[in-house]
């Protein structure tokens, strides 16, 4: 996003609105999210799928050392896009919120309560001098007394609940896949396959199974898919598309 001369004065202070009602530092934080690798979530009746394209840029990097899907509590997980260090801070805060709630009330925290707490923190970082907005967005998924839940959080502190959504640089490509193929009556297995397909399309057909990180949250709790299962799923989904294209 190009900086116009008239707006430079409003870049200096995070708490100053421009004449047209914009907070430029929040907009720049959103740009950081757009530059991040694609993360997505899909909600079905059986549970919620979270997936991320980790984009390992060098063969010298151990793929398992890069983590962008996190467990928050036994029934909640999160996927991130944007600045990884900022995401870690928010994930740790979310874990503390969940643990504190469980210790205080003797029961697991509802997903929307946790999401609102994290978004409240994000919003505070848009109001005070000496800090900057978090340059990351989170997809927070879980299962609570209200059923399966999937939320998207914005650097401004805004939150929205979704059936399926994506963040990061491949957001639009993934949403195009969801618009065409998502169904509310999908099985969890079908949702996982859709996540793999959407991540592949979002990468402009350049990603590999090694770059994918996928987790599921259902009534049994949070769990990440094993590498072997992701490779088998990737081969089945991507292989079938290549066969159709021949």
From Swiss-Prot:
GO biological process: proteasomal protein catabolic process; ubiquitin-dependent protein catabolic process
Known regulation of activity: The formation of the proteasomal ATPase PAN-20S proteasome complex, via the docking of the C-termini of PAN into the intersubunit pockets in the alpha-rings, triggers opening of the gate for substrate entry. Interconversion between the open-gate and close-gate conformations leads to a dynamic regulation of the 20S proteasome proteolysis activity.
Annotated GO MF terms: threonine-type endopeptidase activity
Keywords in alphabetical order: Cytoplasm, Proteasome
Pfam families per the UniProt record, alphabetical: Proteasome, Proteasome_A_N
Function per UniProt: Component of the proteasome core, a large protease complex with broad specificity involved in protein degradation.
Subunit details: The 20S proteasome core is composed of 14 alpha and 14 beta subunits that assemble into four stacked heptameric rings, resulting in a barrel-shaped structure. The two inner rings, each composed of seven catalytic beta subunits, are sandwiched by two outer rings, each composed of seven alpha subunits. The catalytic chamber with the active sites is on the inside of the barrel. Has a gated structure, the ends of the cylinder being occluded by the N-termini of the alpha-subunits. Is capped at one or both ends by the proteasome regulatory ATPase, PAN.
Family of this protein: Belongs to the peptidase T1A family.
This protein's name: Proteasome subunit alpha
Annotated source species: Methanopyrus kandleri (strain AV19 / DSM 6324 / JCM 9639 / NBRC 100938)
Compartments, record wording: Cytoplasm
Keyword field contains Cytoplasm: yes
GO cellular component, one term: cytoplasm
Source organism phylogeny: Archaea, Methanobacteriati, Methanobacteriota, Methanomada group, Methanopyri
PROSITE patterns associated with the record: PROTEASOME_ALPHA_1, PROTEASOME_ALPHA_2
InterPro entries according to UniProt: Ntn_hydrolases_N, Proteasome_alpha, Proteasome_alpha-type, Proteasome_asu_arc, Proteasome_asu_N, Proteasome_sua/b
């Amino acid at each position: 996003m190009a900086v116009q001369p008239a707006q430079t004065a409003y870049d200096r202070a995070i708490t100053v609105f421009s004449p047209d009602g914009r907070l430029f530092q929040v907009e720049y934080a959103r740009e950081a999210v757009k530059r991040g690798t694609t993360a997505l979530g899909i909600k079905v009746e059986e549970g919620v799928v979270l997936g991320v394209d980790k984009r390992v840029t060098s063969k010298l990097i151990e793929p398992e050392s890069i983590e962008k899907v996190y467990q928050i509590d036994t029934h909640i997980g999160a996927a991130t896009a944007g600045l990884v260090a900022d995401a870690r801070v928010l994930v740790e805060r979310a874990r503390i919120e969940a643990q504190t709630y469980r210790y205080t009330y003797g029961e697991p925290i509802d997903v929307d309560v946790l999401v609102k707490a994290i978004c409240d923190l994000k919003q505070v970082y848009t109001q005070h001098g000496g800090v900057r907005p978090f340059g990351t967005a989170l997809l927070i998924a879980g299962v609570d007394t209200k059923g399966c839940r999937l939320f998207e959080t914005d650097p401004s502190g805004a939150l929205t609940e979704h059936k399926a959504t994506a963040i990061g640089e491949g957001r639009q490509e993934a949403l195009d896949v969801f618009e065409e193929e998502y169904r509310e009556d999908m099985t969890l297995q079908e949702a996982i396959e859709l996540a793999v397909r959407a991540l592949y399309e979002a990468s402009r057909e350049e990603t590999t199974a090694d770059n994918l990180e996928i987790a599921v949250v259902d009534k049994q709790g949070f769990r990440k898919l094993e590498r072997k299962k992701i490779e088998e799923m990737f081969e089945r989904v991507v292989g079938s598309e290549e066969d159709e294209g021949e």
